[in-house]
Amino acid sequence: MFLFLFFLVAILPVNTEGGEIIWGTESKPHSRPYMAFIKFYDSNSEPHHCGGFLVAKDIVMTAAHCNGRNIKVTLGAHNIKKQENTQVISVVKAKPHENYDRDSHFNDIMLLKLERKAQLNGVVKTIALPRSQDWVKPGQVCTVAGWGRLANCTSSNTLQEVNLEVQKGQKCQDMSEDYNDSIQLCVGNPSEGKATGKGDSGGPFVCDGVAQGIVSYRLCTGTLPRVFTRISSFIPWIQKTMKVLQQS
């Protein structure tokens, strides 16, 4: 899930993660009622999961790379292994951005149309989206939550969260020529070592109660910062796509 990365790179193999990470803090139960747990299957019928967030009663936003078959969304969850008063709803239409690029991770955003409208209550609520002119600035500290993987390679049963600092785009550009600050966010202060982990993809980066980013990917070095999708750059696409999905 949320990882504190220690400086052991010099003494560990490149792909080793187990000895260098511990995870973040458990969220207060149901304190993030917009969160969605998304389960789906790949072409080999292997199960996967991502995070997402409710942006309308019948629409969940997530990352485009979280697309698959037989997608189901669980709303109102805290511990996904316990019996809770959740709403499990099938997805009838997944609409990833038509220009999503698996290699560069550009346009890593997707909307899911739910089979039925969610019942909003104390543990299930929508979250606000930014205006197209909103711009998250370097130095701003916002929060990510998710059910991502822990240090022992198991996924977290309970929702975890961490505060992460927005970095200057140049930090990510120096590490990857594919980074594009106009549509992406560079997130995570290397000196603090806090980060998202596998399984947190698709979750929201929340600043002052507004979903400003989507957890997208980590750079090829495996180190901080991470790259998130910048939601404000996609508002026209979101509005158009939501209208089409809700009319279908």
Curated annotation (Swiss-Prot):
EC number: 3.4.21.-
Keyword Signal on entry: yes
Keywords: Disulfide bond, Glycoprotein, Hydrolase, Protease, Secreted, Serine protease, Signal, Zymogen
Tissue specificity remark: Mast cells.
SUPFAM superfamilies in alphabetical order: Trypsin-like serine proteases (SSF50494)
UniProt signal peptide: 1-18
Subcellular location: Secreted; Cytoplasmic granule
CDD domains per UniProt: Tryp_SPc
Annotated protein name in UniProt: Mast cell protease 8
Residue span(s) of domain Peptidase S1: 21-243
Active site: 65 (charge relay system), 108 (charge relay system), 201 (charge relay system)
One GO biological process term: protein maturation
Disulfide bond positions: 50-66, 142-207, 172-186
Propeptide: 19-20
PANTHER family for this protein: KALLIKREIN-RELATED (PTHR24271), MAST CELL PROTEASE 8 (PTHR24271:SF22)
A cellular component term, taken from the record's GO annotations: extracellular space
Predominant place of localization: secreted
Family stated for the protein in its record: Belongs to the peptidase S1 family. Granzyme subfamily.
Record SMART domains: Tryp_SPc
Glycosylation site residues: 67, 152, 180
GO MF annotation: an example: serine-type endopeptidase activity
